[in-house]
Amino acid sequence: MEMTLMDAVLNSGDTAWMLVSTALVMLMTVPGVALFYGGLTKKENVLNTMFLSLIAFAVTSIIWVLYGYQFAFGADIMGFIGSPVNLLMNGVGVNTAAALAPTIPDFLYIAFQLTFAAITVALISGAVVERMKFSAWLAFIVLWVSLVYVPVAHWVWGGGFLAQLGALDFAGGTVVHINSGVAALALVYLLGKRKDTRLLPHNLGYSVIGASLLWFGWFGFNAGSALTAGGLAASAFLVTNTAAAAGMVSWVIMDYLKVGKPTVLGGISGAVAGLVAITPAAGFVTVPAALIIGLVTSVISYLAVSYLKPRLGYDDALDVFGIHGMSGIWGSVATGLFAAPFINELGTGLIYGNPGQLTAQVIAVAVVAAYSFVVTLIIGKLLDFTVGLRVSGKEEMEGLDTHLHEETGYRI
């Protein structure tokens, strides 16, 4: 007799680890991203910047339990979307095992995936700070999560056509980082440049704390994506830390070469770039491969931020595309190069004799990037035509905290 999910035996160790991992990933958004981004903006915009991440988490949480999870992870329909048979969580039992993680409860897997959806849209906010209407941002969250994140998550993780193609993404290189980075690029194209495009961090201490919380939370992000408390989680944990450390050191070296001094902002940017790049590869690569991935990714992101952005003239305020988009692309491609079958039998990369894996990775990168860019442009155009995307010039110059929220971050 075939065992059903109701008959599956839940594992208390796996469940405990995944509860911790889910909380760790939540910590990345609230308050990790909020603090990281908030410290990098002008003091007149710190509350608005932080609130963009907080409200993204709240709105996405509602979308996810209403319909988002089911469309992303429901039974596959023609490779493109999931079947919404359990809308509003109807039919999901307290002790029902998750279909994609049969040793943990379904509710826990739903919550874990919720934190990924929330941080993805929160990351986009870093590109549009200091000039986007809050009302437009609220509408953008609903439309983007529904029309971009949910389908892409299904294609890669929910049994959709990219999964069927064999594309690997252990914890979100395509679904989270390429998706958010390219969407950010599309949105800033529509918004245009700020009146003052200088990066003037008003409190780098906030950003250091935020980056530290991101680094800490990323162990839940990557090691948690093993979905069990076993050897694969431990391997993902170690390679995640290795890539982050290599990314930080690499960016500091680039700072020395360009300006002659190390910068704190450069160090934390490099760590985040390393974390982004190892995300798709964390459950597939060795420690030496993680070291290479981290060292290389900071060079790529550094060049994107320092040379590509000014050459192309787009105003990605906090370099979401330069760090998340570019490092996500490199990490996804690197997975196709370095995936080791003795780490995870699901992946064999080019250097271990499987060029087809690299091909699958490149296709996934191209498909997700193209879809995210085009649909984000359409969403942005629609919002610009209806509610308007951008605040007034007066509001932008005087700061969004007082004009949009009637509050101020500091009373000194």
Swiss-Prot record:
Give the organism, scientific name. Methanothermobacter thermautotrophicus (strain ATCC 29096 / DSM 1053 / JCM 10044 / NBRC 100330 / Delta H) (Methanobacterium thermoautotrophicum)
Identify one Gene Ontology CC term for this UniProt entry.
Answer: plasma membrane
Q: Which GO terms describe its molecular function?
A: ammonium channel activity
Transmembrane feature ranges: 16-36, 46-66, 71-91, 107-127, 137-157, 170-190, 204-224, 234-254, 276-296, 320-340, 360-380
> Which NCBIfam families does the annotation name?
amt
Q: What name has this protein been given in UniProt? A: Putative ammonium transporter MTH_663
Question: Topology versus the membrane, per the UniProt entry?
Answer: Multi-pass membrane protein
Q: Where in the cell is it found?
A: Cell membrane
Give the UniProt family note: Belongs to the ammonia transporter channel (TC 1.A.11.2) family.
PANTHER family, per database record = AMMONIUM TRANSPORTER MEP2
Report keywords, A-Z: Ammonia transport, Cell membrane, Membrane, Transmembrane, Transmembrane helix, Transport
Q: Which InterPro entries match?
A: Ammonium/urea_transptr, Ammonium_transpt, Ammonium_transpt_CS, NH4_transpt_AmtB-like_dom
Primary location:
membrane
